Amino acid sequence: MRFGWWENTVVRNLDYREAWAAAMRRTVDVEEDIGCEPALSVVRMGDTTAATASIAQIPVRSNARGWELTAHPSLESRRVDGAWREIRDLAEELVIGRTQRLMVHVEGPWSFGANVEYRGHALLRDRPAFRDCAVTLGEAVAEAAQWWSEAMGSAGNPAEVIIAVHEPRVAEVASGLSGSTDFDTFDPVDRQILAGVWERFASQVQRPMVLNTHGPLDDGVVDAVGASEWEAVVVAPEQLQSSAAKDRIGQLIGTGQRIGWALGSVEVTAGIEGGESTAVKMLNQWRQWSFEEAMLPRMVDVVVPEGVRTKGEASEAAAAARIAVSSLVKG
């Protein structure tokens, strides 16, 4: 399944109505031919952990280190719930009929378990509690995706919904998560267990999913990716700086895994020139891997990396991604 490109952008200093309008100008109301239907990202809030907890109706409250489970909804939980209601209401007003493909961004179970505390420790430390939350999360994301599909589609033609799973802390989980104190440590999680939790999540959600770890993929995470199923896995620019890292990604592609090529720090701010530069880099690297050039547009999407941006910065980054994909599609 091709996506062409997608963005991992939180736009600051915009209300949700403006954010929806700007997102459609970046994604839907464009001239570039990317060879497939673009995926419009559902407007995001600044904190993915809190937004994901709200989707799952898991009550949390903030503490000095981040978030912790609570027995009853906190003021922060209610505020995020209200934001989601506004985002959905505006989508029904502004988005219906404009696109048939949407991307919903959520935090993955491993990073959620690392970012949320339970009884003073990372949720991961309590296996039954982590399992219950992970299962609840999977069920809730499935329900949310169903709502977006039905609400944004038309009679007999539901919208396609892709789930962008953000796992910024999975590398820490795989290598041994640090606790709230020097004496609070968490053993490394085996790659098969990593993959197993992802597979259970996927079986619940039943939607195309893309994985974003917000950084390089080490051996353990790559093995877990290979043992699970993702439509695409985001590859950070720094992942392609060493021969060993390039080989690791090349081997992953060789197994049939599609990747999302994240724009570099220079290209993401350079608009059209950044897109043209990215297309050249992608083609050169593809040739180094010795894959057939005709496979490149089918196996690689372009991704705007995770970031908080102004409306102008978001537009520049999206333009770079669209130009890169369009250049590759045109050959």
Labelled PLM ranges:
Residues 136, 140-243, 247-248:
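Active-site loop segments of alpha/beta catalytic cores
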Residues 1-107, 111-126, 130, 227-229, ...:
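Alpha/beta catalytic barrel-like cores
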Residues 231-331:
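Catalytic-face loop-and-helix region of soluble metabolic enzyme cores
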Residues 96, 203, 253-254:
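Anion (oxyanion) recognition and catalysis
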Residues 104, 141, 302:
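Conserved, mostly hydrophobic/aromatic
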Residues 16-23, 79-90, 131-144, 187-201, ...:
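Well-ordered, non-membrane alpha-helical segments in soluble/globular domains
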Residues 7-14, 107, 167, 211-217, ...:
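Structural motif
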